Amino acid sequence: RDSEDAPKATSVAGTWHFQGQIQSNKLKSITSWSNVIHSLDEIKHFEIIEKVAVHPLEIFCQVSLDGSTGRGGAGIDKVKELASVIQYSSRHRLVGLMAVAPLGVQAAQAFSQLSAIHKAFMVDFPKANKLSAGMSGDFEEAIIHGATHIRIGSSILGSR
């Protein structure tokens, strides 16, 4: 969360990852302290990033596995459009895909689907070889299906 992470990033050195749904009005702040964004799902947000970012960012495009935008993410066609725009940036780097398992879907099924999507995506975007998937309750299944980054903040810091 931007409101929680921004102050911490100024006092603790490291590589800071932003995870969560992006709001246009928060992008200037997010890009001031984060090094990696895990949840980009709109071209308009990337256009803002290009204007306001003070340093280069690594970016994961968030794909929706069930077509719903309620938990963030875009359909794979929209994600490919977004990735095409990012890959031509002189400052920012497309590093992979991110997804959240849909509610009511078994983690194994969701992450198997994501793994297949990611493999097909890398045909067009071979440098996007990272996969951000899995949270505190399902990260083991995500790792089995190729996750390189897991999001387990609530296991470490507690629920927010």
Which positions does each model-derived feature cover?
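Gly/Pro- and small hydrophobic-enriched strand-loop and loop-to-helix capping segments
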Residues: 147-160
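Conserved alpha/beta-domain cores
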Residues: 1-137, 143-145, 157
